[in-house]
Amino acid sequence: MEQTYQYAWIIPFLPLPVPMLIGLGLLLFPTATKSLRRMWAFQSVLLLSIVMIFSMNLSIQQINSSSVYQYVWSWIINNDFSLEFGYLIDPLTSIMSILITTVGILVLIYSDNYMSHDHGYLRFFAYMSFFSTSMLGLVTSSNLIQIYIFWELVGMCSYLLIGFWFTRPVAAKACQKAFVTNRVGDFGLLLGILGFYWITGSFEFRDLFQIFNNLISTNQVNFLFVTLCAVLLFAGAIAKSAQFPLHVWLPDAMEGPTPISALIHAATMVAAGIFLVARLLPLFIVIPHIMNFISLIGIITVFLGATLALAQKDINRGLAYSTMSQLGYMMLALGMGSYRSALFHLITHAYSKALLFLGSGSVIHSMETLVGYCPKKSQNMVLMGGLTKHVPITKNSFLLGTLSLCGIPPLACFWSKDEILNDSWLYSPIFAIIAWSTAGLTAFYMCRIYLLTFEGHLNVHFQNYSGKRNTPLYSISLWGKEGSKISNKNFRLVTLLKMNKTGRPSFFSNRVYKIDENVRNMTPPFLSIPNFGNIKTSLYPYESDNTMLFPILILFIFTLFVGFLGIPLNQDVDILTKWLTPSINLLHKNSNNSIDWYEFCKDALFSVSIASFGIFIAFFLYKPVYSSFQNLDLINSFFKMGPRRNFYDKIKNAIYDWSYNRGYIDAFYGTFFIVGTRKLAEFTHFFDRRIIDGIPNGVGLISFFVAEVIKSVGGGRISSYLFFYFSYVSIFLVIYYFLNL
């Protein structure tokens, strides 16, 4: 076993040859390298598979022996400073390694077909392999210096992948936004690292925790300074894991290819922030104020992410806000000290969200056969619907991921989310109410995404939903500001509404659907992908190829069974608790991990009831209009009541405006930070040119003009010089006389 741990240093470096060789090949032998591009994809999968097997071996040994291994090399040693590099293998490292490698392998296999049309195929695989290397290096780091180095590499890879299609202005802006937002958090992380080094004199986790705990117990530190340093450390996690208020980059990150979103949201970038807080939890847990702050940020993010997901029309952005909300649950659990629950939810959410994103990519891939390559159309749920019979495997997989995220037993997220919800009651009733309410919102918006995508008719074939020939295709304002040139009225939250004779929207009414004769020519190809120029569109989507379906089916199985890791089946301790024993003992001495099944079932019944209520509301509002509900006069009469209807519309519109406008947070940042910075820059430029440069330039000009005046006065005649001389002497004498009176 010792020998296995000694070779664990190769974990982050095994995937590294692929991006290096691809880069050299494209520089030196571009034609040959491109002709063998499938070989490079195979090597990426092969090397990451070796890392996965190695990580599984380490995990099995840790479960059986509850051991922690650390190896350190000292590079610079003197009396005052030592720089050490090494690797740490503990339960957190092994969990993250398995998560990164399993999801990474499936995403790479999926991407082989998804990116086959793209000229950037090799560049994509180089970025993805380097992304995996950076993340594996992050989770195996044994000190804060290594953490920061790999932290920045993860940020760089995310910048490259989000802006993969950099010729699209939207993608270029999105990667810049992600880069700048994360720089704010990374600067705080750097200051926090330096602050704790100044306090403890060490970067190594083991020494850092021990020295800091001793200083706290003997009251030898300034608590205000310590809290400030902890907040700065946490700022890095806030930015990386898209927590409020540095969450604004996450929905824009959907401008990259969908497999990138699956990797970022499941196992790499956003998981890095959760990993950092979990790694530093022994440091944070002795500072009560920072733990309260972590839980506060978590609960705000939980609710904010759920509300922002309510009215998204882009399928990937809806899933992105879902990720934000679920990461908030993990951060809330860490702030409450529920280390095991946070990591449990990290595992279950990773596989469920990877399943959803790969399913979303399969849907987008199928829609591109109808609308061509145009993300605004292929990812727009207004053009979807009725996909059940066309993509049945994708539909069933997406449904399973949806139900898992909703918290329906016995799927993965049910077990982990319930633990966090139950712990929240013990921590704060207010936080618990918000967390449980958000569970209902989660069920609502996830079911909404599913219904709009797969149920009903294939909406891309319909010219409009009002029976008017001149109404443009994007006339339904529910789906955003996509540009109705005729109708300016807002139909929000509830899909497929129609104006009746009184000018009010009606929920259920007969519609005349018009087939768009120009459906084949709806979308011009995008310039960055020339292969799409000659793509032939069809009238109906079709199921993705087996290369894309295989990873989806594997994640389908994971989502079904991974939740049982945390459930004690015919044994005293579940596998996850046994796995995490060294870390749990470090945080909570003599902790009791037994489960009260009666309390669990009671709380589970309550949580499932809330989720079921959210699903019912989604079905009530978003079930296709041709369903049996349209004949229920009771429902129609209820919504046609005057005052009640007006009140309902106001609430609906307010929710829609909040959600569609991203809570006005982006607008606030744009007004007060971007515009403010520009105004400050303009003022600084004016001050520099007119004041700083103006003073010396003005003195020079005045001297020049005075000299010119004096020069013009003197004409070279001695009589003139004598006249001015006696004049000045006379003036001087007069002044002197009056001063001495």
Curated annotation (Swiss-Prot):
**Name assigned to this protein:** NAD(P)H-quinone oxidoreductase subunit 5, chloroplastic
The record's subcellular locations are: Plastid, Chloroplast thylakoid membrane
Which species expresses this protein natively?
Symphyotrichum cordifolium
Keywords assigned: Chloroplast, Membrane, NAD, NADP, Plastid, Plastoquinone, Quinone, Thylakoid, Translocase, Transmembrane, Transmembrane helix, Transport
Task: State how it assembles.
Answer: NDH is composed of at least 16 different subunits, 5 of which are encoded in the nucleus.
Example GO biological process? electron transport coupled proton transport
Q: Does the keyword Ion transport apply?
A: no
Q: Which domain of life is it from?
A: Eukaryota
Task: Spell out the Gene3D superfamilies in the cross-references.
Answer: 1.20.5.2700
**GO CC terms in record:** chloroplast thylakoid membrane
Q: Where are the transmembrane segments?
A: 9-29, 40-60, 89-109, 125-145, 147-167, 185-205, 219-239, 258-278, 289-311, 327-347, 354-374, 396-416, 425-445, 549-569, 605-625, 721-741
Q: What class of enzyme is it?
A: translocase
What are this entry's molecular-function GO terms? NADH dehydrogenase (ubiquinone) activity; quinone binding
* Pfam families, alphabetized: Proton_antipo_C (PF01010), Proton_antipo_M (PF00361), Proton_antipo_N (PF00662)
